[in-house]
Curated annotation (Swiss-Prot):
Pfam families: Formyl_trans_C (PF02911), Formyl_trans_N (PF00551)
Binding site for (6S)-5,6,7,8-tetrahydrofolate: 109-112
Family: Belongs to the Fmt family.
Cited function: Attaches a formyl group to the free amino group of methionyl-tRNA(fMet). The formyl group appears to play a dual role in the initiator identity of N-formylmethionyl-tRNA by promoting its recognition by IF2 and preventing the misappropriation of this tRNA by the elongation apparatus.
Keyword Protein biosynthesis: yes
Keyword Lyase attached: no
Entries under HAMAP family matching the protein: Formyl_trans
Gene Ontology CC terms, in alphabetical order: cytosol
Reactions catalysed, as given in the entry: L-methionyl-tRNA(fMet) + (6R)-10-formyltetrahydrofolate = N-formyl-L-methionyl-tRNA(fMet) + (6S)-5,6,7,8-tetrahydrofolate + H(+)
Name of this chain's protein: Methionyl-tRNA formyltransferase
Keywords for this protein: Protein biosynthesis, Transferase
Organism of origin: Pelotomaculum thermopropionicum (strain DSM 13744 / JCM 10971 / SI)
Length: 313
């Protein structure tokens, strides 16, 4: 099948490679422009662009997707289908109608749950026990199109947004290939989304901040959902302290002061919350690297009784 692929981050790379391995004729890759990244703010190509170059596939990076010249280019390519995997922009109506079989999207949730830009993060943050992949025919709405295939994966307490991301990237690639096979055979179902939708908006800076008056379970899920990016943060000695890993050690009981360090031992720093306690096992002080709790405490004492989050200046 003649395919134009639209995608940007690491999540989309397995899908692009799977299309090529399945024998599809990937005419072009459309991805977002190079962006400054890292401490040096060096212009860096998106992961999908790097993968496309390795596969010798032409790459286009329009500054604006609502552009007459870009739309004309897509029409000239004459794809049978456009596959969209985490491209990062809403596809306008005049592009949706170009391919014979339409635009097919791979979305990282069990629609209609978690429509939007950050479904993986929010599924973990909200303590979901499962999530998954949905492929769908795209329409003008935000992840509202008719579904084709859907498959669930479990989320365990050991999972982070990172591990769920990696599992869904692989699953999404497999379901995309299966979906295009069904589409090409004229056998793809069109299943309208039913039930009450929920939404996964882009993460904001305030979403990273740990509110210690919440429950230990909620904070634990927040930490997992912010790992490996952007990191759940609090404050210690006037500096940002990111907490990367923790465990719930007590579900009940409130601290005298939420955020108070109850103990700081060899393997964990136990912190009181609005209900229950968590044991912090991996953390990172502003300007330093990620460390286990034991290694952190060897270089940075954390007295019992100190309250995290108080020194926000």
């Amino acid at each position: 099948m003649r395919v134009v692929f639209m995608g940007t981050p690491d999540f989309a790379v397995p899908s692009l490679k799977a299309l090529v391995e399945a024998g599809h004729d990937v005419l072009a890759v459309v991805t977002q422009p190079d962006r400054p990244r890292g401490r040096g703010r060096k212009e860096t190509p998106p992961p999908v662009k790097q993968a496309a170059h390795a596969l010798n596939i032409p790459v286009f990076q329009p500054l604006k997707i609502k552009d007459a010249d870009f739309t004309a280019l897509l029409k000239k390519l004459s794809p049978q289908v456009i596959a969209v995997v985490a491209y990062g922009r809403i596809i306008p109506p005049d592009i949706l109608t170009i391919p014979k079989y339409g635009c097919i999207n791979v979305h990282a949730s069990l629609l209609p749950k978690y429509r939007g830009a950050a479904p993986i993060h929010w599924a973990v943050i909200n303590g979901e026990k499962e999530t998954g992949i949905t492929t769908m025919f795209m329409d003008e709405g935000l992840d509202t199109g008719d579904m084709i295939l859907q498959e669930a994966v479990a989320i365990t307490e050991e999972d982070t947004a990172g591990t769920v991301h990696d599992a869904l990237a692989v699953l999404g690639a497999r379901l995309l290939v299966q979906t295009l096979e069904l589409v090409g055979q004229g056998m793809a179902p069109r299943v309208p989304q039913q039930g009450i939708p929920s939404y996964a908006p882009p993460l904001k800076t305030e979403d990273e901040l740990i509110r210690w008056d919440r429950t230990a379970r909620d904070i634990f899920n927040q930490i997992r959902g912010m790992n490996p990016w952007p990191g759940a943060r609090t404050y210690f000695s006037g500096k940002v302290l990111k907490i990367w890993r923790a465990a719930v050690v007590e579900e009940e009981g409130a601290a005298l002061k939420p955020g108070q360090v109850m103990s700081a031992g060899r393997n964990a720093i136990v912190v009181g919350t609005g209900r229950g306690r968590i044991a912090v096992t991996e953390l990172q002080l502003q300007g330093a690297r990620r460390l286990s709790a034991g290694d952190f405490l060897r270089g940075t004492p954390m007295p019992e009784g100190i309250v995290l989050g108080e020194a926000c200046s």
